[in-house]
Regions:
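Hydrophobic alpha-helical membrane-insertion segments
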Residues: 92-110
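Hydrophobic alpha-helical transmembrane segments
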Residues: 133-151
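Short, Lys/Arg-rich, polar N-terminal cytosolic tail immediately upstream
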Residues: 1-10
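Single conserved hydrophobic/aromatic residue that forms the stacking wall/gate
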Residues: 156-159, 163-166
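Short, membrane-exposed interhelical loops at transmembrane-helix boundaries
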Residues: 120-138
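Alpha-helical transmembrane segments of multi-pass membrane proteins
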Residues: 26-36
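Juxtamembrane non-transmembrane "cap" segments at the membrane-aqueous interface
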Residues: 107-126
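Membrane-helix interface/capping segments
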Residues: 63-85
């Protein structure tokens, strides 16, 4: 197996990015859904802190993945796939990355505008409370998660991506 992508297949680095992202998202999305219905408690605070730390990790992982993707070819889709399907498959991936970044950024902004400090591993962020903005970013965060679930479903059931499964 090659480390880098070729025009016909994904390399080991892309596959590692893919499976780490998949594993983390499989944990993160249900964890967030569980948090929505929890009453305030020590347990909720602990789970929320884990959720935030994992979210920040997803943000950094996605940025690294996009940087890597910029400098490596993406394997071509099978020639038997219609042009419209190719375009849809590529757009789906673009929107997938946008939704992941939207979710992580809106989650961080929701926390900050709620008056909470955000530890970004390398530095701490803190801004002035604005509960109206916190609510808006919370709604964006929730909408982004529903969008992510739909996009992931479309990617994994659509014919254009099948020849390139990682």
């Amino acid at each position: 197996m090659k480390l880098k992508n070729t025009l016909t297949e994904y390399g080991a680095i892309s596959k590692i990015f893919h499976w780490i992202s998949a594993a983390v998202l499989i944990i993160q999305v249900p964890l967030g859904m569980y948090l929505v219905d929890m009453d305030f408690s020590e347990e909720r605070l602990t789970i929320e802190n884990i959720h935030v730390a994992v979210g920040i990790s997803i943000f950094y992982l996605t940025i690294l993945r996009l940087i890597y993707k910029t400098f490596n070819p993406t394997p071509n889709l099978n020639n038997s796939i219609f042009t419209g399907q190719r375009i849809i498959a590529k757009l789906n991936h673009v929107f997938l990355y946008i939704s992941i970044l939207m979710i992580t950024i809106s989650g961080a902004l929701k926390k900050l505008y709620n008056g909470e400090e955000l530890n970004m591993f390398f530095f701490n962020l803190e801004i002035q409370d604005n509960f109206n903005l916190a609510e808006i970013f919370y709604e964006i965060h929730i909408l982004g998660n529903y969008t992510l679930i739909v996009l992931l479903s479309l990617i994994h059931i659509s014919e254009p991506t099948r020849p390139l499964h990682i």
